[in-house]
């Protein structure tokens, strides 16, 4: 429990450090998108093959177990939302082992660790995702991870990574005298978007990785706390049973001694 709580503090601090970066990237790209021309449409917004899309899920599980129902809930959520022809790109050894040889949708050559997420790991994953989307290998890419709802609860969620949705990339209403209200995009909106869109996506993946890792440590701490309490209760019950058995044995021995002494006296 103490080790889990220590890891949770570090993971939570890392998540809190990452959140402002991701929020700023979302704000930045939301201020660029309205300046993009409607035609031609940027490939990152292109929705294709709508009737039967080639869909992939980037699934963030843990590298280790003993975290309660953390991994089971995530995989159950994935199976409930996925179609038979979808593909699973799984981060984390637990999810990989759970699906390997059991689910043909798993992409076995895709293997990444979930422990101690790094920005470089998120970049590598983003490059692979963008390449598969641009080449037409995939039509839709979703990320499935565990989102922290509050200090005590978390739950699996699914967010679309590609294609991007303009509806969710709109700038917040400008406040009175807001110095960020107007932006000048140099050389043009398309070029700026080409540069920041991949950064936004790997920030999105990195944010999900750090949040999932934090949720994993929280689930493991809760599981270890529950296991510790259960062990203490078991020890208490065993001590009571031992004391009762010991007391019964002592009582039996005393009874036998008294009975033997009485028999000796009667014989005399």
PLM regions: where:
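C-terminal beta-strand-loop-alpha-helix "lid" module of Rossmann-like NAD(P)-dependent dehydrogenases
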Residues: 1-268
